[in-house]
């Protein structure tokens, strides 16, 4: 009875609300036929759809019964999720039995070096197909999986057009080496090192070409990739044509407008003048520096950005030759003026089949060309702090050499060029508009990717297959930056830089696979293979200024040049064995041996085994009478993976570097250089990760509810880290060593619910939750802490630290003391060691920037031709050091400089700190804020149509129109602009292992999009 109440109530509610719409067809004058639909066991099927001539005419009720208007003899089609469609001629009283859809049950999932039946997987593997009807503004492939997969956290680097993302699967596995997952695109394993203009491997593929994502999360699934699988694997399969299908042309395009979602709260011109008058007096020299304008600098640097995306596809197939061709263009303006991203992509895929389908080819080719115009992001911080009483431009002669832009200037030194009588005050902020306009920073990047897969099912030995894959990727990136001599950042000489980077990776893999079913209820397959990989990088740069006047006019100033190259090889042997008994008990074992050129003799080879067991409990005899359980499978897995990324190619032997500084010339002012030895370690070896995983897959009530739960523990040892060494013991104060251990323990779950499936209504809700707890178990030597997370206050101003026993991303701060009203007392922190002296020993570990809890929720509701969807994402328990709050903690900072003024925020008046040279004023837990959030990534409303313009010789036009809002809202307690802080650094250097410092990145915009999909 509970089962009936659960299903019947929502159906009645929707019938009541939408009864008129659902009953219109009841007035049609046709004959009435009745029937009953059940499954093979005799259980009634509720929610089966009945169609005639392509039109839905009914749906079964709670008892599997239906009544429809149809002429006897009319062909009816009955469909139900998870079962094979059934066609039957209409008659007075029908009893229809539906069978399980073997194709769906045996749906294959792409895994490492092969495919597997989804129902037979023993590892933690999630496969999804992008939801074409419920997605927001998508520029890169990572946008399609954000918040969609349990255990996968995607944080975009910024809101800059074409920017990349930080992807972490189950929290990452390293402190210093790479935490990026391995990306595999159509069998080609990509490297994670980009070139100028390419943010990451996911930016190299057109999102509209993607057929599916498969994410391998535990070591039993990833160990087949050995040294590259420690951080998980994301396998991308692109779309293909279908054999024997007619040519089909389709178009998908959209236009969007993006705006700034939130501005930093700062004083306007009138408020600022009032504050300066209050602090210093209206007759003071500081007040005299103020202007008469009321400039909102943030609104001067931002704009409404218009973007568009267009894709054309042709696909089809001859009898033995499926094909697909596509071309795409993305043009995206950034909300920060002058920024722009353009990308052109093309792809071709053909899949010829020969020799009675024994010999199959999969040939892929992809091309991408990207252009970037980078805005000077320093303008963002300067727009917050620049004096709002000053104008953007001025006709005053003192600003002539600044192209008329107002700046804080001073008299140039007597020895300086007399034709440049004024120069910018070095410590003062810069006019943010001039920073943007003076900077022309562009990149051009090309990427060519392709592979040829050959699969041969050997004649006479059909159980034996030979598979080979020849693949390669070549990229070239060129970046040119020209800064005008009137720029406040490169005054007088200007700045010119030319930067070129190239890379390629070649990959060859071959394996033999043997399949055998025997004794009717046992299956065995074994695979063994070899892989060879070569990655090479090379490039150069040249930067200089130009003398604008005088005897050296036109000559280069302070020119620096450099060339570099690097390469490494990886040779591997691997194998996998699968055994199943009674299609119920499954065992999988893998082994891989990797040999890397990055390690010395004796350490080159790493060995990575795994094993997993699966049990389909629902296939047991004692479960046969429990009809409410459609699937119940237990999984257990163990495996070992490795790591060699993020350490460079030559750190195990002695190398020398040519310095670029003029003081290194030999002899003094000569043409020679003194080469500097680099630190090295011949004992480097593989970083290894061991993972244990237990999981449950389930489906209830004929797949109305389905999901999975996984519990895991992962421990990484021999961490590759830059560890301190004793003085004079090497050629630096730090050297890469194998030291330390790291643990991740977690639980993740996903759930899909289909509460409504009627003739006109379909509703699907998908959610996921992840809990991950990490801990640094051991560090180098005596466990000395490793500080990081600079907040820009000079030596020692790091707000984060790695320490044994603490989670990654821990803040290392002083404990703030408050008054009775909860207001922080300036300079009063807890003396934790009670020695009367405040120093680093009084800092403590407080919270973490990494959220232990992650949530994702997607919903798609469809009514006839209409669809409505949204995606939510939440992060709970993550904290952020609010650097902006720290920087504006005192209103007195507005006049702290000599000859210039700076703006501030209303917050500064609330805290009202005084000027101080004590670093611990700023390094307190007061500035570490709870940054938990709930975000709505997108809301979409669409309408699908078909048979438009249908004619005698034309089947008509089908398609969909839709409207989407992206990055719609954020609910958070965090005071900053955005609680989602990435690990990217403002200077573009190597990101920290965990974000946590709010550096006022390029803001993520709110975007409104109109799109159309057409099938001709």
Residue map of PLM features:
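Short, small/polar-rich motifs associated with maturation and membrane association
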Residues: 2-368, 376-377, 420, 424, ...
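Hydrophobic alpha-helical segments, especially N-terminal targeting/anchoring helices
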Residues: 31, 37-38, 60, 183, ...
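Short aromatic-centered micro-motifs
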Residues: 50, 78, 183, 579, ...
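C-terminal extracellular loops and terminal segments
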Residues: 142-146, 734-743, 783-811, 845-856, ...
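Extended ligand-binding clefts on enzyme/binding-domain cores
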Residues: 187, 805-813, 819
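Acidic carboxylate motifs that coordinate Ca2+ or other divalent cations, activating on Asp/Glu
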Residues: 835
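Glycine-rich, aromatic-lined ligand/substrate-binding cores of catalytic
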Residues: 848-881
